[in-house]
Amino acid sequence: MDLSNLRPAIGSTKNRKRIGRGPGSGNGKTAGKGHKGQNARSGGGVKPGFEGGQMPLQRRLPKRGFKSLNKKVYALVNLRDLQDIFEAGSVVDIEALGQNGLVSRIYDGIKILGDGDLDKALTVKAHKFSQSAIAKIEAAGGKAEVI
């Protein structure tokens, strides 16, 4: 076997369906569309979600809730990530977090969450902190500074 005689595995490919090419093909005349009706016409068919005139599901169900236009979206970082990456005494700010791949896109700022343990004294600068994160940072001898 070489590159000049490679063939697809048996049964892995199908011949394409040539429609409207005479009665002997099995798909001549109406080309598999049947007789008349909306689906036989060019551009025929119903739009997605159309239920034949019955009130569609989307309109039968009640509206619920809303999306706040003023919602703040923070990039989240946990203390366990800071523990693994940063050395004791270092300053953790937006640039340091970005260089180490902990945040990629910042919309409304960075929030530090308290998941994991911290035993290094770090100076952490962020837009928001959870209460548990502040407690753990200060217990380890570090500082939590709000930007």
Swiss-Prot record:
Quaternary data: Part of the 50S ribosomal subunit.
UniProt biased composition (Gly residues): 21-31, 42-52
UniProt entry keywords in alphabetical sequence: Ribonucleoprotein, Ribosomal protein, RNA-binding, rRNA-binding
UniProt-recorded name of the protein: Large ribosomal subunit protein uL15
Biological processes annotated in GO: translation
Transmembrane portions of the chain: none
The keyword Ribonucleoprotein is annotated on this UniProt entry: yes
Xref: Pfam families: Ribosomal_L27A
